[in-house]
C-alpha cells in the first residue's frame, strides 16, 4: 500500500498530464519544397511549453516594462513547476521537430540589446501621476525631517510648557500647595453634600412630626365621640392606635439622622476651615522663601556685576588701552617709516645727475659761498642735544661723493643740486625728524596704567579728584548716570529691607 503523499503526488502528476494533453500541439512546418511564404523571424525560444508565455516573451514592446518583467517571472515559475512535475512515467505525446524545422537561436547581440532594454526599463524612475501630486499624503512624504520635527515640537508645545511648570513647582515646593488646593475643593464638595443631607433630614423629620401629629389629632377626635362610634370608627381607631408606635419610631429615626447629618456638616466645615488656614500658612511660607530667594538672587546678580566691573577695570581695560596704544604707536611708526622711504627715494633720484656732472660744475659747486635750499617743512636744528643729533644723523641718509667727507643733504631738486661744507655737516646742519613728534605723541597717547606701588596709587587717586578738564561723550555720561542711579536704588532698597520692622 502506497503512502498518502505518494498518492497525492501521482494524482497531481496525472492532472498536469491531462492539462498538457488538452493544449493544442503546434503544427510542424513542412520541408521547404518551395519558397517560404513568410520569412522566418528570430524568436527567442523559451523553455516553457505555454503558447501564451511565448507570446509574452516575443512582444515586450506592447506593454510597460514592469508588467512585462512580472509576467515573465510568473511564466518562468509556471514553466519550472510544469517541468518539475514531468517524470519518465508520464506517457504524454512528445513532438520531435526535424532539423529543417528547427529555428536558429537569436544572436548574442540581439540578446544583449534586449537585456539592455530590460535594465533601462527597471532603472527608469517611477513617474508620479499628476493627480497624485496634490494629495495630502504625497505632500506629507515630501516634507523634510526638520519640518516634521518642528511641527511635532509645536504640537507638543503646550504639554511641554505644562511639564516645565510642573517641574518648577516641584523645585520650589508649590506642588504641595496645589495638593492642598485640590483637597480643599474636595472638602468643599463634601460640605455641600453634607448640607444637602441636613436639609433632607430636616424635611423628613418635619414630615414625620406632621404625620404623627395628624394621627394624634384624629385619635383625639375619635375619643371625643366615643359613645357614638360605628364599626368603621372602631376600625379606624384601632388602625391609628397601631400606627402611632410606628410614627413614633419613624420620628425618632429621622431625628437621629438629622443629628448625624448636622454633626457631619459641622465636621466638614471645621475640616474645610482647617485646610484653608493650612493652605494660607503654606502659601505665606512659600512666598517668604521665594522672596528670600529673589533677594539672594538680586545680591548675586549685583555681586556678579561688581565682579565684572572690577575685572574690566583692573584687567580688561588696561589690556585694551595698552593694545590701542600699541596699535597707534605701530601706525605712527609705520607712517614715519613710509615718510622716510619717500624722502630716501626723493634723495636718491638725483644722485646719478650729480655724479655725471662735468669738472666745471664741480668747481662751481666747491666755491666758498655754498647755498643750501631747505623746504618749508624742514624742522629746526638742535645743537645742545647730542642724542637728537644722533637720531637725526641716523634718520637722514648720507650721500658720499668723490670727496671722502660725508655731507648731509636735506632736500635736493634736479634744478638746484648743492652740497654742504665739511664744518656744517656734524654740528650745525643736523636735522632732527623724530624730536618734534615726541611732544605730539605725548599729547595724543592716553596715560599708561599705574604700577602697583603705593605712590602710584596715591597719585592715581589724586588725579581722580583733581581739577583736570576732560572730554567725555554723551553716551558715556548717560551710562555713568544710569549706573549710578541703579546702584543708588539698590543700596536704598537694601537699607530699607534691613531697617524695615518685621
Curated annotation (Swiss-Prot):
Keywords: Coiled coil, Membrane, Mitochondrion, Mitochondrion inner membrane, Transit peptide, Transmembrane, Transmembrane helix. Pfam families: She9_MDM33 (PF05546). It is a multi-pass membrane protein. Residues 58-140, 350-407 are annotated as: Disordered. Residues 65-80, 88-101, 119-140 have a biased composition (Basic and acidic residues). The chain crosses the membrane at residues 296-316, 479-499. Its main location: mitochondrion. Residues 500-502 are mitochondrial matrix. The keyword Membrane applies. GO terms for cellular component: mitochondrial inner membrane. Required for the maintenance of the structure of the mitochondrial inner membrane. Involved in mitochondrial morphology. Causes growth arrest when highly overexpressed. Belongs to the SHE9 family. This is Sensitive to high expression protein 9 homolog, mitochondrial. It comes from Neosartorya fischeri (strain ATCC 1020 / DSM 3700 / CBS 544.65 / FGSC A1164 / JCM 1740 / NRRL 181 / WB 181). The gene is she9.
